[in-house]
């Protein structure tokens, strides 16, 4: 059977979602053309052109690199329908009007390739009804594909089949969305708002009702329903502002229009809350309108007050007693909240009870398994646990009895009882819906295993739900060596893996020792070494706290020794006789960045943020980062002009002196921390698979470490040029005197110090300059202020 390939995608509709879906396709290097209506005035593509230009301005950016917006093809329905013929996937993302969508499908049908998949990004309209406008030949290739906003950052994509969708089409699309786009796929049934929005929006509406019942303010509720509750840090009302209150109202209307008391016993709870209507009527649509439930005025945050229709000061916090309750084990936590006397505790129990109740009643109608619900809420709403996971962790039958007691007492939002499967049969016997055999499918009455599509073979450690069986990276494979700092192990006996275990995967002397030992072992018995950790970040940098005791006891010489050891570790990585591959995900800062750039190859997750940030704590990169900048500048100059180092050096100097961090793997490549020979991976859970195979490919290709070479530096003339611009910044008040001092030291290292331009140096020479600069700063009072400020508050000190 031929492998399904997506060589080109058409996105129909250049609105907020359509344009951002196109942007994400560009991020992962999928050719895409964006369609919209022809403009009534001016160039006919101007609607699409404006949408693409707007992508460059959005924050957070939908693009890995803003300039890549220009790679999106532009088209309109009047002139360019022929471009659809070579598209393998067509994603429709126009406004949520059934009649408009049906009309568009009729228009595009004659231009579709026989093999093309057509998918609607509707957030809740019936996929089956939408398919009725398509010719019979296209219906088997039609389905729903619901991205969450913003599509670059949100993991969830829901796929929805119709009765006529070919199973292979859904399998092919799931593979592409998972591996090609880096998303978590949940298959939803064709019901209003599918899974995540059905559960999530119903939960938000219920929360708004309970807020009124218990007389709480929006700031207190957000404090209670954010990180403390294991949910998105934005809480309930800030999340609504980010989503857009008009968007939320539209999703609510979908529920109102397509459900009834007969199909949803909670239907009476779906009325538009008075506060939501009042805000929308006033034009306060949330973040995009700069006012919603909250409003920022200068540095002050205000909250809306329904009674007065005015904004009043916000910032109130929840009573700390409930913060302590929420830290207790799940079973104890829920019982404490249920028995709480104060309104905040009663409110928390009410919203949790409502979520358990709603999810259980509707599981069979909206999803195949409980796994689909919990994954949808994790990936679509930023929850650490889905509703069934929390319920199971707290004690399945105990919680079920508490919920049913509240239903019987009339305290719940609906009189609908919990389904029989909650109390009887396999779920009750297993103590929950997630087991080693699989997740509960109420329609079949069995625990159903995960889909075993080939694409999931690329995920050595998929994200598991509570109660699921599966490998855990902390104990998987064969451990070769392990201590508190690092685990050295192998999955296949061919490639060695080093996993850093310190907090934030900070690089301590023990980590360096472990890496050195791992390289020694890999050179003797393995094809390569992969540096990978199963969770984020890759590494937040050198472990300053681990260095402080030696510094206090011995003085700066201890720091110089530690820095020297880190530098030697980096050189050992670079010149190892087997390939060392760094599998980077999340933050790779300071020493973490240096660890990555000194590896033979980097395999980098799209959402990786890489940079040399030592300036923020008053230091310079001291483990080879500045040496790397100087060497790369020389290499780039050699392949370009062969003479002028300064243009290439200036880019690296600026990145280090301004502590620039790439906001994606693509931007990190522009900063020089990711090379064009490196691999960028869309899905975080495929990182280890790709890194292991990259190490094997290098080994099988006859990998040899690079030669130790001399290379030219810019010398005193280059330093003088750089210092000239720094003087202007200092005198203009853009940087402090200490910033100027640090930047001057960086300039001195990357240019090679007081030597003639073009002088040939080696890495050891530049690393000596690095150590001296680093050690001169660590005893500086202003640097010590910055270090202590960061350690105590987590925030940079500017002095």
Where are the language model's segments positioned?
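N-terminal glycine-rich phosphate-binding loop for ADP-containing cofactors
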Residues: 1-529, 533-536, 543-578, 585-592, ...
């Amino acid at each position: 059977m031929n492998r399904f390939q997506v060589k080109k995608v058409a996105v129909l509709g250049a609105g907020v979602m359509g344009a951002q879906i196109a942007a994400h396709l560009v991020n992962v290097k999928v050719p895409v053309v964006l369609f919209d209506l022809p403009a009534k005035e001016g160039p006919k593509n101007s609607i699409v052109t404006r949408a693409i230009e707007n992508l460059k301005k959005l924050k957070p950016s939908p693009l890995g690199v803003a300039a890549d917006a220009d790679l999106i093809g532009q088209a309109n329905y009047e002139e360019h329908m022929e471009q659809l013929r070579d598209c393998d996937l067509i994603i429709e993302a126009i406004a949520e009007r059934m009649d408009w969508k049906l009309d568009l499908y009729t228009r595009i049908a004659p231009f579709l390739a026989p093999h093309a998949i057509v998918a609607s990004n509707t957030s809740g309209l019936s996929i089956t009804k939408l398919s009725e406008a398509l010719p019979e030949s296209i219906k088997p290739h039609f389905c729903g594909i619901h991205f969450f906003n913003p599509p670059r950052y949100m993991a969830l994509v829901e796929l929805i089949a119709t009765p006529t969708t070919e199973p292979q089409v859904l399998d092919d699309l799931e593979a592409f969305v998972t591996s090609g786009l880096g998303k978590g796929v949940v298959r939803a049934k064709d019901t209003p708002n599918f899974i995540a929005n059905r559960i999530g929006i119903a939960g938000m509406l219920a929360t708004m009702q309970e807020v009124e019942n218990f007389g709480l303010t929006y700031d207190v509720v957000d404090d209670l329903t954010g990180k403390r509750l294991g949910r998105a840090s934005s809480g309930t009302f800030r999340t609504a502002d980010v989503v857009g209150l008009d968007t939320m109202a539209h999703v609510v209307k979908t529920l109102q229009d397509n459900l009834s008391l007969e199909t949803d016993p909670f239907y009476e709870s779906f009325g538009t809350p008075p506060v939501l209507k009042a805000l929308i009527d006033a034009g306060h649509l949330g973040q995009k309108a700069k006012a919603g439930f909250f409003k920022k005025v200068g540095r002050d945050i205000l909250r809306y007050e329904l009674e007065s229709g005015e904004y009043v000061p916000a910032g109130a916090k929840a009573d700390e007693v409930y913060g302590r309750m929420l830290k207790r084990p799940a079973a104890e936590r829920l019982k404490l909240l249920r028995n709480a006397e104060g309104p905040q505790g009663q409110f928390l129990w009410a919203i949790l009870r409502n979520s358990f109740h709603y999810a259980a009643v509707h599981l069979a109608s909206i999803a195949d398994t409980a796994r689909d619900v919990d994954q949808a809420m994790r990936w679509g709403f930023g929850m650490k646990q889905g509703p069934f996971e929390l319920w199971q962790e707290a004690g399945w039958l105990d919680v079920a009895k508490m919920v049913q007691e509240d239903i019987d007492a009339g305290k719940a939002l609906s009189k609908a009882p919990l389904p029989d499967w909650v109390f009887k049969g396999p779920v009750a016997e297993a103590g929950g819906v997630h087991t080693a055999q699989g997740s509960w499918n109420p329609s079949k009455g069995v625990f159903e295993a995960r889909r075993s599509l080939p694409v999931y073979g690329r995920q050595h450690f998929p994200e598991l739900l509570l109660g699921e069986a599966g490998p855990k990276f902390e104990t998987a494979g064969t451990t070769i060596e392990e201590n508190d700092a690092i685990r050295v192990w192998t999955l296949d006996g061919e490639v060695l893996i080093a996993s850093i275990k310190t907090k934030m995967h900070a690089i301590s002397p023990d980590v360096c020792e472990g890496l050195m030992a791992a390289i020694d072992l890999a050179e003797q018995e393995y094809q390569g070494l992969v540096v990978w950790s199963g969770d984020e970040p890759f590494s937040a940098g050198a472990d300053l706290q681990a260095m402080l005791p030696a510094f206090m006891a011995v003085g700066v010489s201890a720091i110089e020794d530690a820095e020297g050891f880190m530098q030697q570790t980096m050189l050992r990585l670079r010149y190892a006789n087997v390939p060392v591959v760094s599998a980077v995900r999340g933050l790779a800062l300071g020493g973490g960045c240096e660890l990555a750039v000194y590896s033979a190859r980097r395999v980098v997750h799209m959402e990786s943020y890489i940079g040399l940030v030592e300036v923020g704590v008053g230091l310079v990169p001291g483990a080879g980062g500045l040496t790397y900048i100087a060497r790369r500048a020389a290499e780039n100059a050699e392949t370009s002009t062969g003479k002028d180092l300064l243009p290439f050096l200036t880019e690296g100097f600026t990145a280090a002196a301004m502590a620039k961090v790439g906001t994606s793997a693509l931007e990190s490549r522009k900063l020089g921390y990711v090379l064009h020979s490196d691999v960028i991976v869309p899905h975080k859970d495929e990182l280890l698979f790709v890194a292991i195979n990259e190490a094997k490919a290098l080994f099988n290709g006859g990998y040899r470490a690079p030669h130790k070479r001399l290379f030219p530096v810019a010398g005193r003339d280059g330093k003088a040029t750089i210092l000239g611009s720094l003087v202007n910044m200092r005198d203009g008040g853009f940087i402090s005197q200490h910033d100027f001092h640090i930047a001057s030291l960086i300039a001195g290292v990357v240019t090679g110090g007081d030597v003639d331009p073009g002088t040939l140096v080696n890495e050891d020479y530049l690393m000596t300059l690095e150590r001296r600069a680093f050690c001169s700063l660590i005893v500086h009072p202003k640097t010590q202020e910055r270090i202590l400020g960061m350690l105590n508050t987590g925030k940079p000190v500017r002095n």
